[in-house]
Curated annotation (Swiss-Prot):
Keywords, sorted A to Z: Cytochrome c-type biogenesis, Membrane, Thylakoid, Transmembrane, Transmembrane helix
Main location: membrane
Transmembrane stretches, start-end: 14-34, 72-92, 162-182
Name of the protein this chain belongs to: Cytochrome c biogenesis protein CcsB
Top-rank taxon, per record: Bacteria
GO CC annotation terms, alphabetical: plasma membrane-derived thylakoid membrane
Function: Required during biogenesis of c-type cytochromes (cytochrome c6 and cytochrome f) at the step of heme attachment.
Membrane protein topology class: Multi-pass membrane protein
Compartment(s): Cellular thylakoid membrane
Keyword Thylakoid: yes
Amino acid sequence: MTIVKDLIFRISSLKFAISLIIFIAISSGVGTFIPQGSNSKFYIENFDEAPIFGFLNGEKVLILQLDHIYTSLWFLFALILLCISLAACSFRRQIPSLKASLKWIEYKSEKKFRKLQLNSSYQINEVEDLISKADLFLKKRGWKTYKFKSHISARKGLIGKIGPLVVHIGLIVLLIGSAYGSFTSQSKEQYLLPGESLDLINESTNSKANIKLVDFSIERESDGIPKQFISKLDFTSEDSKFNEVKTAKVNHPIRFKGLTIYQADWAISNIVLEIDNILYQLQLKEIPEIGNQVWGILIELGSETKKNFLLTIDNENGPLKISNTENFSGNNLYINENPLEVNSSKVSLKKIIPSSGLIIKNDPSIPFIYFSFILIIFGTIISLIPTNQLWILVNQESQSLSIGGLSNKNLVGFKKEFFKLSEEIKNF
């Protein structure tokens, strides 16, 4: 039994909880540094030659489950342990403290008043009905009172005692919600061209809808660097009774029927070329070997002898570079400019069609997360409320009035109120 009590004491200690929080925070930070959810080959290829922190190669990353930290056994165990620590602290400290606060404490001796933080004593001429008058006076001032024959116990701000317990409950809900979300959340990356649509199905709420990309645009800085990606999306419910156009931007996601749509990326998916008076819409693919965010396609050009040419583009405004695969010399082609003659073929660029990269995420844990933050914020705010206690004792034999007070916060503020109340009560 002693071992169990000692274990509960250690688990419920503040030092243990803080140590766990620091460990979870560091682990979460590592999770943002190491790519999560990739296949084993990715970690072996990327981290064997350049180990993380100088010693974590691909094999160690996989053994330590650093490739999926948030669903790893040791991370979940840390979350569970922190939940147990917070619950143990609540039952061992917060709840007994709250119960003790609910009990009315009686001070019947003038000697006990002298030991309080604040105390004052007065000689009075009339003691009759003083207790009743003081009781009514305090109630009008917002104090909760318990009246005895010759003394009064009063308190105000008891809700502040509930604050730490509410914060603990909020943290527990947050941890449970985070663990739940790690296993149940789903995400899908989808590229849409203007005019294309996608059916959305939220399995957790059993709701269906259709999303259509109305327009996609890119805002750029003066030096050409992308500043913002903007997708205008048309949402239509399954029964077509609901229709709304919303705009998604980077760091400004859309929430719709339990789903969250993030603006994540972009691409140049298609170009429209006119080759020898015939229009062609060509689908491009990303070519990382050439550079970051470069898209292209290999085509044959020539009215007589056909040759391979590589078409590449890295900007939604152009130009399109046409390169000879033999020596990679080429020319730039701009939208609606005069056609270029390439190997006896006349080529002109009519349209560049960018696509919007969206991440559609379904996370059933979001309501838990929001609710937990509401609890944490509410608990933090009310725990700032000071709990003040007041005692009044009337000694009929000595015709004396003793008043004492305690406050767990803001003693300076309570001191002003205490002496103001004392002056008014003694003059009854």
